[in-house]
Regions:
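Asp-based, Mg2+/Mn2+-dependent phosphohydrolase catalytic module
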Residues: 2-24, 130, 138-215
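Active-site neighborhood of HAD-like aspartate-dependent phosphohydrolases
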Residues: 2-58, 196
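Short, acidic loop-to-helix structural element flanking the phosphoryl-transfer center
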Residues: 18-21, 89-123, 164
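Short catalytic/ligand-binding loop motif for oxyanion handling, primarily in non-cytosolic enzymes
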Residues: 30-33, 39, 118, 131-135, ...
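Short alpha-helical
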Residues: 37, 61, 103, 131, ...
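Helical cap/lid subdomains and adjacent loops of hydrolase enzymes that gate the active-site channel
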Residues: 40, 50-56, 63-65, 81, ...
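A metal-dependent, Asp-based hydrolase signature
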Residues: 63-94
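Conserved phosphate-coupling serine/threonine residues in phosphotransfer and NTP-handling enzymes
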Residues: 126
């Protein structure tokens, strides 16, 4: 396995001849993920409930299980109700309502379209709950996600980034050549996980950087 590089540190613009496939994370690359903003929109008149939902739902112990595909929203809402006391309906509102208030990150979509124009294969690699992923990709933003050629999502393979297994599943499922692939993620440890498995990385850590890179 050849040594992987961080493209955002090595190059000012995309080295198109160096890659055949570009892999995109979803949250904060293509779709905004900002739980503190979501709870304000979902529970606008109750600051305490906003804080509790942020801690109990988005920052709570069950969230990795949603991503891994081992726990559904209905079951989780009941568990949260029994543990913390808010109504089941409140937890379901927090678990499902955020999907309706997540806006696209246009910078990420411009990058994806540019990659497609350059003849590159496009894939997804994301930690995502099944219900949320299917709502975004098959309903709310179905036309946008149609540009992708496939990918690996945590809820289906039951691995979460940055576990090695999810990158190996991506390579296998999408028939990737790691040294000809770059992965874009907003979380550095996930980028480093890809690089550990031979895939080049790109850490999206500030607004505007993808517009400058994918020109």
């Amino acid at each position: 396995m050849s040594e992987a590089s961080r493209f955002d540190l090595m190059y000012e613009t995309m080295p198109w001849d160096a890659v055949d496939a570009i892999v995109f994370d979803i949250g904060n690359v293509l779709i905004r993920y900002a739980p503190d903003n979501f709870v304000e929109l979902l529970f606008p008149s109750d600051v305490k409930k906003q804080q509790d939902m942020l801690a109990q739902v988005y920052g709570g112990k069950y969230w990795p299980s949603f991503d891994r595909g081992t726990l559904g929203y209905d079951e989780a809402a009941q568990l949260l109700h029994e543990e913390y006391g808010y109504a089941v309906e409140d937890y379901l509102h927090a678990l499902r309502g955020w999907l309706d208030v997540k806006p696209p990150i246009e910078e990420g979509w411009r990058a994806a379209r540019k990659c497609k124009e350059m003849g590159k294969k496009l894939y997804l690699l994301s930690n995502y709950p099944k219900e949320g992923f299917e709502f975004l990709t098959k309903k709310k933003f179905a036309d946008r996600f149609a540009i992708f050629d496939g990918g690996t999502i945590s809820c289906y393979c039951h691995y979460n980034k940055p576990e090695d297994d999810i990158y190996q599943e991506l390579i296998r499922a999408c028939n990737l050549t790691p040294e000809r692939t770059v992965f874009i993620d907003d979380t550095l440890k996930n980028v480093e996980g890809a690089m550990k498995n031979g895939i080049h990385g790109y850490h999206r850590h500030e607004n505007g950087m993808m517009d400058r890179f994918f020109i």
